[in-house]
Amino acid sequence: MINIAIDAMGGDFGEKPIIEGVLKALEAKPFNAILVGNSKILKPLIPKKLEQYIQYEEANEIFSMNENATDALKNKETTIYKAINLLKEKKVDAVVSAGHSGASMSLATLRLGRLKGISRPAIATLMPNIVSKTLLLDVGANTDCKAENLFQFAIMGEVYAREIMQIQKPRLALLSNGEEECKGNELTKESHQLMKKIPNFIGNAEGRDIFNGEIDVLVCDGFDGNVILKACEGVATAIFQLLKNEVKRSFISKIGALLIKPSFKKLKKHTDWQEYGGAPLLGVNGCVIISHGKSDSRAIKNAIFQAVNFSQSHINELIENELGKYNA
């Protein structure tokens, strides 16, 4: 059975939504949950019927969102440090944390190490498109990149799309300010030339192409990726709020809204980041899923499902093998 370490107290809202998410996940599929935190606080939240799937790793300190990520290595008593350490010692198969994302990345990179051939790990996240989903990476791990980094991100993203998203030949593109090969800055142009070696590379793509369903994996540096991610979150929230405002304007609008309510629910579910749970940190020697600090129980549940699927695959081995083809 898969063993998942969960940073049980690291999110913005404390342990309650995290534990609720763990319980929902356990009701859907069996796995062993190692809750990292204060067991005196956590144990009363666990129903007896699920106690057999729960273990505890004592940790009484939380790495604050206000702390600098570079300080994560100094305090070995925090929940995130102990969770990552369990993975390093191979006592668990994966880690899920809604705590300080910078600390998670720093600890995972320095404690677990990088995969062979990877110079920098990347955070990958799923973005909804009109057909299914697009994998976008990097979305925050590396604000400054070299062309070789983006090439490695491309390989990692392609393997993830093939193994986890079950896309046999994932269409891979590079984010730029135009589709033409000559467009972009020096980083984009150099990266484009490297990515041409990859058979599934379809060229440059613009920001709007994320949503047209014609790209499976889109590669960019962590600065651009994070800006895109946060902008999309804001746009989605604004659109749904505007729709709510318009519906309230007249009786006819309210009747119309009732008629299409099921469609709106499906749309909201498709565009809701909580449905995707978390973002895998690709390129480290292990499985680390980084969840949003504001994750509710549904997001935690889905992040755990991601961790289970990742752990049941051989994705890290496949990434190293794929990179080896180009480095030989």
Curated annotation (Swiss-Prot):
Pfam families: FA_synthesis (PF02504). One of its GO terms (biological process) is fatty acid biosynthetic process. The keyword Acetylation does not apply. InterPro entries: FA_synthesis, Phospholipid_synth_PlsX-like. Pathway: Lipid metabolism; phospholipid metabolism. This is Phosphate acyltransferase. The gene is plsX. It comes from Campylobacter jejuni subsp. doylei (strain ATCC BAA-1458 / RM4099 / 269.97). It comes from the Bacteria. Homodimer. Probably interacts with PlsY. The lineage of its organism: Bacteria, Pseudomonadati, Campylobacterota, Epsilonproteobacteria, Campylobacterales. The keyword Cytoplasm applies. Signal peptide: none annotated.
